């Protein structure tokens, strides 16, 4: 009968070692919970970290940017500015459109923000123009967030007006109802309408004016309540033919009588079926189309939303005629799925590599199976907690699990190695398990909690970066905790049942060769360590040198914010001279599209021209370029962008700005390039003075490329300078002048046609085909107080001036946004510093302020908090270690290993040409938790040898280094191989994962070599320091 160690042996593991059935069932429960949880986890690109954002759009056709600003945007801004929880308010007022974007604090629920926005709009209603065609409309969407899906609707047999009508009523409305959809926009502007084009000469000859015609149409088409009759026995509802539904009815409308004969609308105007706004157009590739852009609500899951739309599409397209084609041009979920799939493959590869390294060291199948079980059990069990915390399967959580592969096996390796050592000495497996697990239990707890302590600061990071990495930190911490539980329960129980002297001693040729190799390595290490211990001050100088080197590398390494991803979609802005018309812009767009579609990496293209709230001016066009899948093209997105810009540069009269779409969107405005810098003033005049000066300076900086500004103050304006005295003498008011101009040139919506399914507008304008340009102004006629017809030229002069094409505000003040990219040989940190230095040379007045926006602002915040984040991680780990060891000194010895990790990580990033971005910084913080385990394993055994065997400190630490060399090497290689697949990643989303892998592999390699020698030296130096303190201050030490 086997004699067991005393009941005190085994520590917390004893109960689980002695009760294998209960332990097995507990692990099965964890496994099942994880498997079930995995099925309920949504899939996403990144954790849901969107700011609650709402966009408010107001359309006022024909209004100038100045009118839109003063009459629409400003009243709305005053009401919105009073809302609590508002983080930032930006607006863009252009010809006929006002867009106000409201970004709220992360802590404010989107539904609460929606209620506040609706209340503010209601409060501003009385301040808005009375003839506003429609009230402001808000959408729970971030305009800078690229659409999750883009669909093109084309037809070769039907006009686009009919196509849009069907798409709007049969498709767009249904998609809008899908959970997670924030906004469905139909680009192309082919909404059906009845267009009335007045012949100015004809109405003038008849003594009529456009205002007469407008009043006639408005009064002839009404749709109002008429009442009902309630008799003794029957009730009758009243109805009438007060609605005109067709073009022919409008043509036959009598607008006046001349000499007893009717003057019909068709006599003085061309009445036709057309589009509500003729200055809007969209194209899919080279074909005119209605383009549907589907944007998600902030916080909505992209995958589930896109899947729901995909499921609906077959049913929706069946309701359309056969001649109408619906094509999915882009679907962001395709790349998201590919990225997640690649990360899942890297996770499985990491598990395989870790198990392989375990077998290489243990050279025993049963001993390899034990930690091989611990790895998937710890990772799968994490899924159950992720479901409970509303996490998702995304790139960051999968990266956390991939890194955790190397972490979770560490505990099991330490336990197995210690138990195996006692079995090899002749102990029975059960006794060895109890003794080995009890001896190593405190070390496991120290390793676990000190590693989790490193992650604690990540949980308290503020703003969007903190939200972004919260799932990463918690997922990793949960996996480590489950690993510790498994290592103290299942692992020693399996060791007691599966290991034996015979199995451990059973060796093949490979095992014997590996054993000899490890013995020689340990022997050499012992020789080198003895020499190092004889020269402690030289070793200490090396340790101090690594600290200084890490600081230097930190200062000089290029710094960035977030890796630029290749998601297969490029957003573009095409810019033409400020006086460009819709027709000329459409022609330029077609030329550019032809060039872009010839590129072998391009799969499809959508383009939009016109002003509708998303596009600020007629001289710009929006492009979305969809690339072929990564495995079907030779170049990544940045090279494709450079190639496209070079090719389009040959097209005269246009500038093309391109940027790849990103999963992380912090901006609230659609910009031309990736990064933004704003100049804000109290007046437009101040901006007009300083914007050109700063623009000239910024364009000269080599750290910036594609520098542009949204300041456009050279738009042509026909300024009507009315002689108010003359007008007053004739009884003509300014309202009469404005109405006449609006009727002629504003595409004025004067009436509404109501049907059972939709509503359509009647559009009034002058027919300018015969009198184009400013000559059309001579055709304007007004009615004097005595009924006479007065030409506009009799009371006004037309002056050609310049004015802004759009007016932008930030928090209610005028602002200009500079957009820029960063060249390949510079980093975002270089660009930011160059801009700050340039700003100082311009000597801006005190009433003009500058600020970075979007990801550039987040970069500044992250960079400023990085040092404090690392300090917080070190302090947190010191506190945990101090509590565990009941010592002020030993935690310092353990933490002395950290500079070596920093040097390795920073050197690896610089050699690989990677920036120090937030992903790489997370890797460095994780290294802080990993590399100290070498010191913990050494110091734990050294302290035990001093305490239990009475060994001298030098002998104790020397023996500890030799005894723990194999598990130290094994655990370090396991962590390294866990990060290796991330470092070598080449698939979709590799840009996001690679910096983490590079930093960790480099840090582990350097720290592994150095800490094996620096830790024992520092341990002995602090031991001498402790003895010195005790000898100098015996009383104080004794009291302590």
Curated annotation (Swiss-Prot):
Keyword Transferase applies:
no
Pfam families, per the entry: ACR_tran
The GO molecular function terms of this record are: xenobiotic transmembrane transporter activity
Identify one Gene Ontology CC term for this UniProt entry: plasma membrane
Per the UniProt record, which residue ranges are transmembrane? 25-45, 342-362, 369-389, 396-416, 440-460, 472-492, 537-557, 863-883, 888-908, 911-931, 967-987, 998-1018
Q: Where in the cell is it found?
A: Cell inner membrane
Q: Its topology with respect to the membrane?
A: Multi-pass membrane protein
Q: What is its main location?
A: membrane
What InterPro entries does this protein map onto? AcrB_DN_DC_subdom, Acrflvin-R, Multidrug-R_MdtB
Which residues, by range, are in coiled-coil regions?
none
Q: Does the keyword Kinase apply?
A: no
Endpoints of the signal sequence: none
Provide the alphabetized UniProt keywords.
Cell inner membrane, Cell membrane, Membrane, Transmembrane, Transmembrane helix, Transport
Query: Quaternary form?
Result: Part of a tripartite efflux system composed of MdtA, MdtB and MdtC. MdtB forms a heteromultimer with MdtC.
**Protein family according to the UniProt entry:** Belongs to the resistance-nodulation-cell division (RND) (TC 2.A.6) family. MdtB subfamily.
PANTHER family listed in its UniProt record: MULTIDRUG RESISTANCE PROTEIN MDTB, PTHR32063
**NCBIfam families linked:** PRK10503.1 (NF007798), RND_permease_2 (NF033617)
Name this polypeptide is given: Multidrug resistance protein MdtB
Q: Which gene encodes it?
A: mdtB
